[in-house]
Amino acid sequence: MHPLIHDWNTTDTPRPATVLLDDETLRDGLQSPSVRCPTIDEKLEILHLIDRLGIETADLGLPGAGPHVVRDVERLAREIADERLRVEANCAARTMIADIRPIAEISQRAGLPIECCTFIGSSPLRQYAEGWTLDQLLRLTEEAVTFAIGEGLRVMYVTEDTTRADPDTLRALYATAIRAGATRVCISDTVGHATPHGAAAVVRFIASVVDECGGGVGIDWHGHRDRDFAIINTLAALEAGATRLHGSAIGIGERVGNTPMELLLVNLVLMGYLDRDLSALVEYCETVSAATHVPIPVNYPVVGRDAFRTATGVHAAAVIKAFKKNDLALVDAVYSGVPAGLIGREQQIDVGPMSGKSNVVFWLERHGYAATDDLVDRIFSKAKASSTVLTSDEIVAEVRATGSG
């Protein structure tokens, strides 16, 4: 952060002792109704980018969905083992032995430890809709966790719709899973119901249940974007005691998606909770976008085309003055809350109807053209008459028309 910034975000909140990340792009991310399922080669490329970003675990898929998922999950698991990637693997499974067994078999064939993320609905809404009783849920929980442990799998026990479930049900379910051997539990805001206050409250409650069971069990947070609270809820969950946070590239996932991993990473770094090289972040997002056919909006934070781009005269003038001071940190701070350099990008000055002449001069000089008065006036007049920002080709055409190119 630039030394001239007074950071009102600084608080007395203790820095979290543990901040781990779990990437859901290749599982929950692909449950979006609009995505194209990537090829195995594309999945491998995404896996390597997850590893380059230092993300601790990646959900490789739900093998219980069928042979095609088993095939891809095993190939991904072998890639981690053969290439000695740092990222650890987990897989989703319903609380059914039929879902858990293929995970154990893949783990054994690939020679790679795989965490089993076995999930079950928990809210009264889901119980009523499905015709379940709590006794049934407890029995399924105990059987599933016990079987997975017996097969040599580490278990994260996941309750769906945790943020709309009652305390007594949650206590019973989590206590059963922990007694059966689960080493992590996951709180899921499955339909994006939670507010930051609610996210923190449910995490603190589950932490108390973990303590009642003897402690030593990690807490995950899995958020969704339905009310557009995913990032702030995830940060609230972290500060309340969650130690592993879930997300997916460009927020893809069920309905409107999951917590966007790239935005979570940027915020964790800017808050001082992580020290991480984010130079692969743009490639990570663009690769997932291309593989899934989910476009990145131009105004998407951090990785969108317009994230560090301005054609407004006042804004551009301040950035240009910072450039002239040869202070790149100032350039990245004067009109940006996220330093472009953090992710390997830079500030971009364009020319449009809201621009001043300094935009034109700066653009020309940055592109190796002499900013003569006649040329500047010509481009400036064209920009003022335009309804959009001028393209590079339009500006170069004006340069050539004056014989300056």
Regions found by a protein language model. Name each.
Residues 26, 62-63, 94-95, 119-123, ...:
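Short, ordered loop/turn segments at secondary-structure junctions
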